[in-house]
Curated annotation (Swiss-Prot):
Record's protein name: Syntaxin-5
Gene of this entry: STX5
InterPro entries for the chain: SNARE, Syntaxin, Syntaxin-5_N, Syntaxin/epimorphin_CS, T_SNARE_dom
UniProt disease annotation: Congenital disorder of glycosylation 2AA: A form of congenital disorder of glycosylation, a genetically heterogeneous group of multisystem disorders caused by a defect in glycoprotein biosynthesis and characterized by under-glycosylated serum glycoproteins. Congenital disorders of glycosylation result in a wide variety of clinical features, such as defects in the nervous system development, psychomotor retardation, dysmorphic features, hypotonia, coagulation disorders, and immunodeficiency.
Phenotypic consequence of Q79H: In a breast cancer sample; somatic mutation
């Protein structure tokens, strides 16, 4: 092994490594002569870098605790706001119910307009009785349904009135009264249309009787038809003994068929008028309920009016007291003298000491 000589003073400075060491290869003779002077050098130490998968750790427990505390306070804030959220939810439910009732009212108004157009027709041959009866039945069912929905909405307002404010409850009652007034107006229009339809049916019946009475009276019945015997009006005796044709039998059958048709028509019109009368009676019950609701609102308005009158009396009493005090102040001459003296003293002080 060939010994090497390291120049430590040139490559290190107070224990700091300055770079690669400079070594010098010595000959064997030189190595033998200097072996007594230089001790053998230790093997060079190689620096091993840390493994790449090793990571530094940091304690983040406090951050986790602070995040938990913030989440807990947020949940507590949500719990404290639950009454407000409940009130908003109830208000939105009331709004949806009122919106649904308003939409149903508009649809029923459209059906009522169509029924009005059909009911005002006075033509005898352009009478759409089936369509009119269907629309009448549908509108009657819609009015009953709307009446029930408005009653449910009013019960909802009464049940939730204690939880909401006074102004909010007044606004809700105003909306309910507005819907009730619209339903009453529509019911009144429906009643008027049914009355017009009844008058038209009476006119059509009288006109049909006028047109059908003359042929019925002009064509007499055969005397043996109701007795069940054979109808024989006459037969001519010819030499060829031909069979006589009975023409009166066909006329009599047509006459009876016409009478049956008239009876069925009159019966159908009677049923229609009965339905109209029952519908008018139901509308009367709806008007009674509406009158009861309006009576309740009238009592509320009377209480508000009494409160306004009481407040007005209090304001007038306060005004009279203020006038009395003002008169007493103006009549007090000593007070005016004192004020005048204070002004004079203030003027003298201002002129003498501050000028």
């Amino acid at each position: 092994m060939i010994p090497r000589k390291r120049y430590g003073s040139k490559n290190t400075d107070q224990g700091v490594y300055l770079g690669l060491s400079k070594t010098q290869v010595l000959s064997p003779a030189t190595a033998g002569s200097s072996s007594s002077d230089i001790a053998p050098l230790p093997p060079p130490v190689t620096l091993v870098p840390p493994p790449p998968d090793t990571m530094s750790c940091r304690d983040r427990t406090q951050e986790f605790l602070s995040a938990c505390k913030s989440l807990q306070t947020r949940q507590n804030g949500i719990q404290t706001n639950k009454p407000a959220l409940r009130a908003v939810r109830q208000r939105s439910e009331f709004t949806l119910m009122a919106k649904r009732i308003g939409k149903d009212l508009s649809n029923t108004f459209a059906k009522l307009e169509k029924l009005t157009i059909l009911a005002k027709r006075k033509s005898l041959f352009d009478d759409k009785a089936v369509e009119i009866e269907e629309l009448t039945y549908i509108i009657k069912q819609d009015i009953n349904s709307l009446n029930k929905q408005i009653a449910q909405l009013q019960d909802f307002v009464r049940a939730k009135g204690s939880q909401s404010g006074r102004h909010l409850q007044t606004h809700s009652n105003t909306i309910v009264v507005s819907l009730q007034s619209k339903l009453a107006s529509m019911s009144n229009d429906f009643k008027s249309v049914l009355e017009v339809r009844t008058e038209n049916l009476k006119q059509q019946r009288s006109r049909r009787e006028q047109f059908s009475r003359a042929p019925v009276s002009a064509l007499p019945l055969a005397p043996n038809h109701l007795g069940g015997g054979a109808v024989v009006l006459g037969a001519e005796s010819h030499a060829s003994k031909d069979v006589a044709i009975d023409m009166m039998d066909s006329r009599t059958s047509q006459q009876l068929q016409l009478i049956d048709e008239q009876d069925s028509y009159i019966q159908s019109r009677a049923d229609t008028m009965q339905n109209i009368e029952s519908t008018i009676v139901e509308l009367g019950s709806i008007f009674q309920q509406l009158a009861h609701m309006v009576k309740e609102q009238e009592e509320t308005i009377q209480r508000i009016d009494e409160n306004v009158l009481g407040a007005q009396l209090d304001v007038e009493a306060a005004h009279s007291e203020i006038l009395k005090y003002f008169q007493s102040v103006t009549s007090n001459r000593w007070l005016m003298v004192k004020i005048f003296l204070i002004l004079i003293v203030f003027f003298i002080i201002f002129v003498v000491f501050l000028a």
